[in-house]
Each structure stands twice: as structure tokens, then as C-alpha cells.
Amino acid sequence: MNGTEGPNFYVPFSNKTGVVRSPFEYPQYYLAEPWQFSMLAAYMFLLIVLGFPINFLTLYVTVQHKNVRTPLNYILLNLAVANHFMVFGGFTTTLYTSLHGYFVFGSTGCNLEGFFATLGGEIALWSLVVLAIERYVVVCKPMSNFRFGENHAIMGVAFTWVMALACAAPPLVGWSRYIPEGMQCSCGIDYYTLKPEVNNESFVIYMFVVHFTIPMTIIFFCYGQLVFTVKEAAAQQQESATTQKAEKEVTRMVIIMVIAFLICWVPYASVAFYIFTHQGSDFGPILMTLPAFFAKSSAIYNPVIYIMMNKQFRNCMLTTICCGKNPFGEEEGSTTASKTETSQVAPA
């Protein structure tokens, strides 16, 4: 084995020379240079500085402006709440531990950090799934005479929490476990060992199928159908400049959102899958740390894509930031008239 396994950790470094120490008790500077740990801390600080304001502003704007408190926007608020879990439950902890070079909060702290970081990430993931389904239902109308309302929006939000808990809670009660990962300064699900005592293999398979493959399939299907429907409508109304513009905006939105999803989750899932299917193979701590950067960065770019590209939200944010005056001269409700045509389809 090219790593060292302890009772509640796995360090991706052979202990042939006897230098490996518990990531809960000693700095892990044999895994990476001290400056690399400092860079990790700096990156976490950047995520906090950028991630907290934009997500907090989303919630604040919703309280201040009634016209954005619509059922179709509930899931966007849920996304902002999920990102706060990631900021406070994961980023702040990793910032502190990176400055010390090891996970100073012990095994219990690892469980808590792993749980909240996973919970926030999974709520965000399933929020994107629900958002795709909602847009598919509203635009493509697979069910005739169906009207999307507040109860449906609340059910969608509740669904994201149920699915997130179904992923984040089992490691706390004996199905898999949370251990330090990468440079041993943050905690996540154990992809490194089979650990039959906690049925780790079955949980990892469950994770890849239910919490990666299925969400990705749903998102690709819904947005594929959405683009097809909008293009078909545009072809039937070629003389309408508004319809043509909406088609281009929707297509652009779908491309951006699919790419964002892939950037966020594919690197992390791919590396985790490789590590799990190549038990004992030689890999450095950076291999798992870098993909985690992409996943954690979603707390910044997901709000930008899904919220700030929403014209209603954007106008209200500008009005709030500029003390009640939109510098671009657009009124908060300027998109209300076209809401059924574009704002429910695309956040552009």
C-alpha cells in the first residue's frame, strides 16, 4: 500500500520512513511544503470574502424586494442557503486548519466539518437538479394544464434537503465515514479505503449512482429538452425578434449552466472514482485537493450564473447596493411583462 491507514484517517503517503503522523495531532508538512498550506488558506479566505457577500446579498434582496419572492425563485434562495453552509461549515474551518498544517479539531470536528460541507454541497447539487426540472416543466409543458405554484416550489426545496441528508448523514451513523482528505486540512467521505466495518464500498457506489450519475442525467435531459422546445418555438415564429432573442439567451444559459455543473462536479467525482477503484495506488495529496477547489468554488460562480444572470434579481441587487437607485435606469419590475416568456426560462 502506498498510503498509511489509521483508525480514523488515511494519509496518502507511505510510512516506510516512519514520518507519517496522525492528521489530527501533527502538522502534515511531509505531504506538501508549508507555503502550499498557506496558499490553501489564502484560497479559502478568497472563497469566504467573495462567497459570503454575494449569497448574503441574495437573501437580503429577497427580503427587501417583494417582486423576486416568486415560487420559481425559491430554489435560488435555497441555493444561497446551501452556499452559506459551505462557507461557514467548510471554508472557515479549512482556512483555520490550513494555517496550522493539520486538522486541529480532531475526529469529532472532522465529522462536523465533513457533514456540513457535504450537506451544503449536496443541497446545491440537488437545487440545480430541481431548477432544471422546474424549467423543463414550465417551458416544455410535459403535463397539460399544469400550473407551477408555491406548493410545488416548497416541495422542490424540501426534496433537496431530503436528498442532501440522505448523502451527508449516513457517514455519521456507521455507513461509511468522514476522514481528512487531500492535504488533510478538510474532511470528506472516505473514497480511499474499502473499510468493510462501515460498508464503505456500498456507500461509495451509492454516492456515484444516486448523487452524481442520476443528477447529471436529469440535468442533461431537462436542459436538452428545454433548448429543443425553445428552438422549435422560434422556428414557428421566425418573424418575432423577441422570440429569436429568447432562443439565443436560453441556449447560452444552458451551455453555461451545463459547463458550470461539469466543472464543479466531474473533476472531483472522477478523481474520487479513480482513487476508489485503484485502492493502494500511488497518488499525491494534491490530486484530491485540486478537484475539491473546483467543487468549493461553486459557492461563488453558481450564484453569479443562476442569480445575478436573472434580470429581476440583478436589477433588485443594483437597486439595493446603490441605495434605492438603479444606475442603469431599469426598474425593478421591468421584466414582469415578459416574465412568462423569458424570466421563467432563463436567468438572462
UniProtKB/Swiss-Prot annotation:
Main localization (coarse): membrane
Annotated Zn(2+) binding sites: E201, Q279
Transmembrane segments: 37-61, 74-96, 111-133, 153-173, 203-224, 253-274, 287-308
An example Gene Ontology biological process: absorption of visible light
Cytoplasmic side: 62-73, 134-152, 225-252, 309-348
Subcellular location, record wording: Membrane; Cell projection, Cilium, Photoreceptor outer segment
Extracellular face of the membrane: 1-36, 97-110, 174-202, 275-286
Disulfide bonds: C110-C187
PTM sites of type Phosphoserine: S334, S338, S343
Residues bearing PTM N6-(retinylidene)lysine: K296
GO molecular function: 11-cis retinal binding; G protein-coupled photoreceptor activity; metal ion binding
Site feature (Plays an important role in the conformation switch to the active conformation) residues: E113
Keywords, ordered alphabetically: Acetylation, Cell projection, Chromophore, Disulfide bond, G-protein coupled receptor, Glycoprotein, Lipoprotein, Membrane, Metal-binding, Palmitate, Phosphoprotein, Photoreceptor protein, Receptor, Retinal protein, Sensory transduction, Transducer, Transmembrane, Transmembrane helix, Vision, Zinc
Lipidation (S-palmitoyl cysteine): C322, C323
PROSITE patterns, per database record: G_PROTEIN_RECEP_F1_1, G_PROTEIN_RECEP_F1_2, OPSIN
Residues where N-acetylmethionine is found: M1
Residues found modified as Phosphothreonine: T335, T336, T340, T342
Quaternary organization: Homodimer. May form a complex composed of RHO, GRK1 and RCVRN in a Ca(2+)-dependent manner; RCVRN prevents the interaction between GRK1 and RHO. Interacts with GRK1. Interacts (phosphorylated form) with SAG. Interacts with GNAT1. Interacts with GNAT3. SAG and G-proteins compete for a common binding site. Interacts with PRCD; the interaction promotes PRCD stability. Forms a complex with ASAP1 and ARF4. Forms a complex with ASAP1, RAB11A, Rabin8/RAB3IP, ARF4 and RAB11FIP3; the complex regulates Golgi-to-cilia rhodopsin/RHO transport in photoreceptors.
Protein purpose: Photoreceptor required for image-forming vision at low light intensity. Required for photoreceptor cell viability after birth. Light-induced isomerization of 11-cis to all-trans retinal triggers a conformational change that activates signaling via G-proteins. Subsequent receptor phosphorylation mediates displacement of the bound G-protein alpha subunit by the arrestin SAG and terminates signaling.
Protein name: Rhodopsin
Organism: Loxodonta africana (African elephant)
